[in-house]
């Protein structure tokens, strides 16, 4: 989720997306992983048509070169006050 330190959503969609990717990066680092270790991404969007360009820009920053992870985008009606959520599957080394 693109939540701020207090757990609330950023009011701007682009900020929510950036915070979600920043939060994800922090979780990956804590696990000894990086964006290169992600093999599957699922994102949830409250208005996919209006939001997709912003998400694609964040995707390009996070995954600048091949191989890209599998990516599924899902339109939803409600995300508990948020407009974007990201879920990933990560491959960790033994």
Could you describe each region identified by the protein language model?
Residues 1-94:
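Short, polar/acidic, helix-capping and beta-turn segments at strand->helix junctions
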């Amino acid at each position: 989720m693109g939540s701020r330190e207090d757990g609330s959503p950023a009011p701007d969609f682009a900020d929510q997306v950036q915070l979600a990717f920043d939060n994800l990066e922090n979780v990956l680092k804590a696990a000894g992983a990086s964006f290169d270790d992600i093999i599957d991404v699922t994102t949830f969007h409250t208005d996919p048509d209006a939001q997709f360009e912003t998400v694609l820009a964040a995707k390009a920053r996070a995954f600048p070169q091949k191989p890209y992870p599998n990516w599924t985008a899902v339109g939803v009606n409600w995300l508990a006050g948020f407009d974007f959520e990201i879920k990933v599957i990560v491959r960790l080394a033994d």
